[in-house]
Amino acid sequence: MAPPNDPTNSIFGVPETDTKKNSFDLSHGKFSVKGVPLLSEVPSNVSFKPFSSICKSSDAPLPLFQRVQSTSFNGGFLGFNKEEEPSDRLMNSLGKFNGRDFLSIFRFKTWWSTQWVGNSGSDLQMETQWVLLDVPEIRSYVLILPTIEGKFRSALHPGTDDHLMICAESGSTQVKASSFDAIAYVHVVHLNTFKLLEEKSAPPIVDKFGWCTWDAFYLSVEPAGVWLGVKEFTDGGVSPRFMIIDDGWQSINLDSQDPHKDAKNLVLGGTQMTARLHRFEECDKFRNYKGGSLLGPNPPPFDTKKPKVLISKAIAIEQAEKARDRAVQSGVTDLSQFESEIERLKQKLNQMFCGNEVEVGCGSCCCKAEANYGMKAFTNDLKTKFKGLDDVYVWHALCGAWGGVRPGTTHLNSKVIPCKVSPGLDGTMTDLAVVKIIEGGIGLVHPDQADDFYESMHSYLSKVGISGVKVDVIHTLEYLSEEYGGRVELAKAYYKGLSKSLSKNFNGTGLIASMQQCNDFFFLGTEQISIGRVGDDFWFQDPNGDPNGVYWLQGVHMIHCAYNSMWMGQIIQPDWDMFQSDHLCAKFHAGSRAICGGPVYVSDSLGGHDFDLLNKLVFPDGTIPKCHHFALPTRDCLFKNPLFDNKTVLKIWNFNKYGGVIGAFNCQGAGWDSKEQRIKGYSHCYNPMSGSVHVTDIEWDQKLQATTMGEAEEYAVYLNQSEKLVLATPNSDSIHITLKPSSFEIFSFVPIKKLVLATKFAPIGLTNMFNSGGTIQSLDYSATSAKIEVKGGGNFLAFSSGKPKKCCLNGGDVGFEWSADGRLTLNLPWIEEAAGISELIFLF
């Protein structure tokens, strides 16, 4: 949970004092909190030290550090001392527990984490990033957080006989240790190498709608297609305010190819994962763009079917290659037919590229030096044509490209480093990206040149109109650290260079972190970075072939995002990733994005848009009715399994400016299989689920401005999907619901205000938007009136126990409808000149 604003209301419920006895005690082989045993059979080599004995100073803002110090008696550090030869990887028990519910986050791939629950130390998964123990005896929770000490990072692992194990590793056989004073923390901590979200500014894109090119084009992205994509959104009345040109724009090639020429005809992700960057500028597809060529009345034609045809052919090649690989595994020795078919398909794909290229420039090398060519000309033309497009981001890997930087092609000292995967990742899911990266190694720029590396890349991008980057494949560094002082020291060097460049070239905020869900990144890389992905990639279908994956994968994605936000949201703005608006479960995704508290963006293919759905998420000017916090699971979901326990509905809560919101989602039907070590469908759980929602499910004390809303005597509650309006109090019964598979309900809770003659009033907002309450911009009451500013156009709803005498809309009288059940409605226009904001006054 997010830390309470008032330290006196901490989860331990003890008053602040500098002399309070520590809540934890380690003695006689037992680790206890306020007298309640948590771990038994704690080895004698395990130590516990109070927070104040380890953390004596900090570069955090003084009020924050003082706040932490004031409750430091609620925390401390666990360590251990091995009486053996120092090692680069040490495993030690912290004790055992059984019969106590826990929630944890573990890495199921190198880069991605998700939720797991159980009730013993042996129930944990490998590479657990933290574990939250339920302690109902004191109506509280205890967090055990593996951290970083010196040159070692740590993670929790399952042990035998209910033991909870901690693993400390350096990532280099040259970096060894045998003892640690602070390798895990109990409760909360600030370590000087990162900053909390409250200390940083988020990028402007968090309040806006955007488009990412990935699912539309994959690696075949090109200027004409990007242009048409933005145009389709604008013509449809939903203007993107930011866009991400994903993988496919860079100058990359394979080791077997000419070191100074781009690889050609790449389409699907996977083929590029052994390729390396050979220059920091854009590839020829963008490099040859001539300024103004798409601005004229007769731009070059572009076949909107082309991307899907290319993707379809590339998928056929991929399937043929998989068939060949299966034949090899089954003992087939004559592969000539397979190879012949693969070659035939590749030739066909190459012919399709040659016959469908759109000329948007002269193609002459001499033109590339001119100011009106290349990425700069393209971004200028985009912003000239599409006035609302504020930001253009581009993708790159942390090491440059998937395969890093090709040695000898730039001024930097790059060396191809073989990849070494930690034993802790042996239990993770098979991942094509890992397979390909291990196959090719990484062209690593020497960490001494990390500053120069990012400055060279980002300063160029900034000059050509790029305002931010999506940095992907972040956790490859842990594969490469043997010769560079270990994973901690290598990461520090790279994150220092990245943060420095972010501050200089992208206003300090223009970076989305992705494939970064490991504690190395959060403890070492977030001093400047303020937004990052909290879920795995949006998969529109199961890449492993389960046809039902088109449905069950979507609930899995939602669980990733909701539970990862519990810790990631303390440090970065959670980004719930893109989705496709014409997907079979697009509405399911849209409901979660509406209240997630982060940016809303899609990866629609050309012609693949559901504008009716998008209009429920996005205002015509490309802004969004964003919640004021980041969405988190409700307390009654913490120790449950909303994916395949066949009974739990996921509930997430958030705040709007004048109310709270709860989203209830039926995510059942899939999840992690610890034996098969993969995420798969659980079809027997893909059923209707029942649950309940209560106003107290919202953690009103988590934001200072929301505290008074949580003290209301009564609330108007609007159910967006069923269009119901009901009243509720903190003491009333819960609202019961039943949700079909992959469906949801959004509950808006608005405090009721008592006006003259005991009239009760509460504005719900625009009901044609998923986050109705987010449309309310301001609210002022007098004894006889309610004055409301509403952004957007459509159906306005309020609860009013009495009929208003009159209503004024933007200074003029207007009609409205009122019914005895309290529904007060009228239609609002979108007024462009007023940024879509209408002023409503109800007089009583």
Give residue ranges: language-model regions:
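Catalytic core of carbohydrate-active enzymes
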Residues: 563-565, 571-582, 593-596, 601, ...
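Glycan-recognition surfaces
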Residues: 405-459, 496-613, 627-649, 654-656
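Substrate-engagement module of ASCE P-loop NTPases
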Residues: 373-384, 493-507
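Carbohydrate-recognition beta-sandwich/jelly-roll modules
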Residues: 2-243, 247-304, 325, 348-350, ...
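Aromatic-lined carbohydrate-binding/catalytic grooves of carbohydrate-active enzymes
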Residues: 204-488
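Non-catalytic C-terminal accessory domains or segments of carbohydrate-active enzymes
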Residues: 2-127, 147-155, 164, 637, ...
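Flexible loop/turn segments at secondary-structure boundaries
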Residues: 217-221, 250-254, 399-405, 476-480, ...
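Eukaryotic intrinsically disordered and solvent-exposed regulatory patches
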Residues: 118, 194-198, 217, 228-232, ...
